[in-house]
Amino acid sequence: MKKLVSSVLAASMVLSLAACGSSASTDTASSSEAASTSTAATTEAAGEGSGAYTGTPIKIGGIGPVTGGAAIYGTCVANSAQIAVDEINALGGDIQFELMTEDDVNDAETSVNAYNALMDDGMQILVGTVTTQPALSVVPLSYEDRVFTLTPSASGDDVISINDNDNVFQICFTDSNQGSRSAQYIDENFDSPKIAIIYKNDDQYSIGIRDNFKAEADSRGMDIVYEGTFTEASQTDFNVQLAGAQSAGADLLFLPIYYTPASVILTQANAMGYAPTFFGVDGMDGILTAENFDASLAEGVYLLTPFSADSEDEMTQNFVAEYQDRFGEIPNQFGADAYDAIYTLYQAIQAAGATADMSNEEICDALIEVMPTLAVTGLTSAGSEMTWDENGAVSKDPTAVIIENGTYVTP
């Protein structure tokens, strides 16, 4: 059954790529262990394809947190990327991948060390980093080394613009898109809400989304009645911020933050009897499985995300089934981004004619040239196509979902 699901999933993804790209010529510990192990591309799965491949694979490096507070993101990214790599290798074609992953514990300095380790191991393309803060330290290095970089989920606008780099592309929405589209959705679907914002003011991801949300909300004349901030050191007590939002009469609380502090906010809001509508973004994905959190408190939470594991389309259901079969868990949006990243690379490499014997600079330049010509239908494209501009920003349609009975539902 596992082989059948993998084959169907790979075939559906490859057919999607061909159709839209022809113009371009278990528990946390077990999942973390699986994710943090460097895995050769020429696995047993590759031998099950239409023709065994014995050449040199292209070495893809991955950097993200598989331990620490953000491990749910990095683990799912690494696992999902491995699924895509195994599927592509099982096709038995001329393009084969070897995936090597390093843990950065969501820390910039550790991420730099991870990058250097991957370079020592012969990395040719980087799929990373998973989060924005480490990316801002790693991207200048990949630009200097001319390593093509496709980040699944580092959404900061600066990730694709720092040092005027030309080698970095994103699968995820930029923070500016997440912020502005969230404000647009709220304005068009809620009846003149009084809005409070709580954001993390020592995290570029949170700051970027907040800034762009506020700019769009102000331009639309939306009513922001309160703003509260917190830091890494203070993300266990939100009583002051929640009391401020409640006193200001806020009936919608916008949370441009990751799920861990969001789960604390929902818990403490419930304890004080404060029940606004909560609205998050892609970092909220994972709240239903947050540790020491009563998931029933997430009932009615909205989030803007390009992926829902509960979607009924065949591609999503096959991916979710394969992930559950391997890892015993439901994949999140970050994992879907990583899966799409590997298949986007597959299409780009085909279009560019890149091969493993080319230098990093040759591969990088070839992929930079073809990326703006691609159109990819993936798990995170909401049934439409992902395209990229020359700056590396992706264009695709976001989807708002609401949590009902422990699942994501389109309102």
Regions found by a protein language model. Name each.
Residues 1, 27-29:
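Universal eukaryotic N-terminal targeting presequences
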Residues 1-9:
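Positively charged n-region of N-terminal signal peptides that target proteins for export
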Residues 16-19:
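C-terminal motif of bacterial Sec signal peptides marking the signal peptidase cleavage site
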Residues 21-24:
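Bacterial signal peptide processing site
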Residues 28, 34-411:
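Extracytosolic ligand-binding ectodomains
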